[in-house]
Swiss-Prot record:
Cellular compartment(s): Cell inner membrane
GO BP term, pick one: cytochrome complex assembly
Function: Heme chaperone required for the biogenesis of c-type cytochromes. Transiently binds heme delivered by CcmC and transfers the heme to apo-cytochromes in a process facilitated by CcmF and CcmH.
The keyword Secreted belongs to this UniProt entry's keyword annotation: no
Cytoplasmic compartment spans: 1-9
Provenance organism: Jannaschia sp. (strain CCS1)
Ranges per topology, Periplasmic: 31-152
Name used for this protein in its record: Cytochrome c-type biogenesis protein CcmE
Gene name, Swiss-Prot/TrEMBL: ccmE
Transmembrane segments: 10-30
Protein family according to the UniProt entry: Belongs to the CcmE/CycJ family.
């Protein structure tokens, strides 16, 4: 009798471990595309996603490219200083959005233009998300004067 209880306990532990492993693998598989907060323009230019894929792009708003069109339509280029991607956005921009400033946009790449549905700007004149800073530094650009996450 005692041996059966021990054997049953071991079976339950094995089933629980397999279930935990399987659920972890499935969650990881489901989140595989969402692990990166954004893609830098150089990565998007090198390996363009299909028009059906919604993703985030992040970098700096290129100087001299911000154009306000009819109504609420705005066009500009986002750059990581290795590549530049044209962006089109219809809506109200964040207050801190401007040329030479950091941004992250959500949308799709259609015919070489990123059609944004959401634009996020950095918090203040000295803040830049760590991911944007790392991507810019990886391209050889050092955004001096910007505080990073965790800096005081």
């Amino acid at each position: 009798m005692r041996g059966l209880k021990k054997q049953r306990r071991i079976q339950i532990l094995i089933v629980a471990a397999v279930a935990l492993t399987l659920s972890s693998v499935l969650i990881g598989y489901a989140l595989r595309d969402g692990i990166n907060f954004f893609r830098p323009p150089a990565e998007v230019a090198e390996n363009p996603p299909p028009p059906s894929e919604v993703f985030r792009i992040g970098g700096m708003v290129e100087e001299g490219t911000l154009v306000r069109g009819q109504g609420e339509t705005i066009t500009f280029n986002v750059t990581d200083f290795a590549a530049s991607i044209p962006v089109s956005y219809t809506g109200v921009l964040p207050d801190l959005f401007g040329e030479g400033e950091g941004m992250v946009g959500t949308g799709r790449l259609v015919n070489g233009t990123f059609e944004a549905t959401e634009i996020l700007a950095r918090h203040d004149e000295t803040y830049m998300p760590a991911e944007v800073t790392e991507a810019l530094e990886a391209q050889g650009y050092s955004p001096d004067g910007y505080a990073r996450d965790g800096d005081s």
